[in-house]
């Protein structure tokens, strides 16, 4: 348990909020809106958060757990945040330096694979294939994270 608490302790409250918004920025990048989410997309996002909670990496799990613990409040707060997706994901990327290279890569993989790809596939054909638009949006978001994570092939 101490390892998980140690992850959060590395960040200020403002930095932690930025990390909590990471899944929201990835979701927004795929669905193309910052607020007033389509309820079907939002339900998929919630399922992807649940799946992400089992991802490897203590930081990712702790961030996702904290998001799920106050999802409604964070959703409202995210809707009022003025940062763009690009600025937000860039800030997430910069903050991950504090977590170490391995933990940072696991966090980025969680954002891209569990959240981004999860939402994109659910929105696509048969709930399994990403549309070309969603795949392009996801690729751009992954680049904003300076991610070394590769998108899974359809």
Give the positions of each predicted feature.
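Small-residue-enriched hydrophobic alpha-helices in membranes
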Residues: 1-154
